[in-house]
Swiss-Prot record:
One of its GO terms (molecular function) is hydrolase activity. It comes from Bacteroides thetaiotaomicron (strain ATCC 29148 / DSM 2079 / JCM 5827 / CCUG 10774 / NCTC 10582 / VPI-5482 / E50). InterPro entries: P_Acid_Pase_2/haloperoxi_sf, P_Acid_Pase_2/haloperoxidase. Pathway: Bacterial outer membrane biogenesis; LPS lipid A biosynthesis. Belongs to the lipid A LpxF 4'-phosphatase family. The gene is lpxF. This is Lipid A 4'-phosphatase.
Length: 225
C-alpha cells in the first residue's frame, strides 16, 4: 500500500511539475518567496491593532509566531530527519533527472513534510478562526494553496509532502488560536470578540495588500518572460 501511494505521489508530481512555461517559472519563483509577502504580513498587524487593545493584539502576534514556529520545527527538525524522504529535486533521488528544475533551485535534503505548506496553512487557519470573514477566509486559503502548489511546480516537494504539511500547520493554527483566544478573554472583555466577524473592522486591507502584491508578481513575470 505504501509503495502504491508513493507511486501515485510520484506520478502526480511529475504531471504537475511538467506543466511549465517561462511566465510560470518566474511567477512561481516569486510567489514562493518570503520577503515579497512582508507587506501582507504587516497588514495583519495593522488589522489587529485596529480591532484590539495593544495587549490583546500582542498576544495574537505571539500566537501567530508560535504557530509558525510549531509548524516549522515539527516539520523541519522532527519529522524530516525521522522520515528521511528525499526531495524529488535532490540529485540523490532516483527521479531527480525527471524533475523540471527552475533556476537550478533544488532545496535541501529531505522534504517530508513541507514547511512551506505547514506555515502557509497554519497562518491561514489561525486568521480564519480569528477574523471569521468570508472573503478574507477565501483569499487566505487560496493564498496558502497557491503558496503550497509553487513547491510542487518547482519540483521541491511531492504532493504528499504538501498535504502532510498543511494538516500539521492547520492543527497548529487552530491550537494556538484556541489558546490565545482563552488568554485574551481575560485580558480585555470590551474589545471585539474573535468569532463574531461582524465586529471586525478593516479586514479587507489584508486582501487589498495581498492582491497588490499578486499584481506586482504578475507584472514582473510578464516582463521577465
Amino acid at each position: 500500500m505504501i509503495e502504491f501511494l508513493s507511486d501515485i505521489d510520484t506520478q502526480l508530481l511529475l504531471f504537475f511539475n511538467g506543466i511549465h512555461s517561462p511566465f510560470w517559472d518566474y511567477f512561481m519563483s516569486a510567489f514562493t518567496g518570503k520577503v515579497i509577502w512582508v507587506p501582507m504580513y504587516a497588514s495583519i498587524l495593522y488589522i489587529l491593532l485596529k480591532n484590539f487593545h495593544w495587549k490583546v493584539a500582542l498576544c495574537y502576534v505571539v500566537a501567530i509566531a508560535l504557530t509558525i514556529t510549531f509548524a516549522d520545527q515539527m516539520c523541519n527538525s522532527f519529522l524530516r530527519p525521522l522520515v528521511g524522504r528525499l526531495r524529488p529535486s535532490n540529485p540523490e533521488n532516483p527521479i531527480a533527472d525527471l524533475v523540471y528544475i527552475v533556476n537550478g533551485r533544488r532545496g535541501g535534503g529531505f522534504g517530508f513534510p513541507s514547511c512551506h505548506a505547514a506555515n502557509s496553512f497554519g497562518l491561514a487557519i489561525f486568521l480564519i478562526c480569528l477574523f471569521r470573514k468570508r472573503w478574507l477566509s477565501i483569499f487566505i486559503v487560496l493564498w496558502a494553496f497557491t503558496n503550497s502548489y509553487t513547491r510542487l511546480y518547482l519540483g521541491l516537494h511531492y504532493p504528499g509532502d504538501l498535504v502532510a504539511g498543511a494538516i500539521i500547520g492547520g492543527f497548529g493554527g487552530w491550537l494556538f488560536y484556541f489558546i490565545a483566544h482563552k488568554l485574551t478573554a481575560r485580558l480585555q472583555s470590551d474589545t471585539p470578540v474573535p468569532g463574531k466577524g461582524a465586529g471586525m473592522k478593516q479586514t479587507e486591507v489584508m486582501i487589498y495588500t495581498g492582491l497588490l502584491t499578486l499584481a506586482g508578481i504578475i507584472i514582473y513575470s510578464i516582463v521577465q518572460s
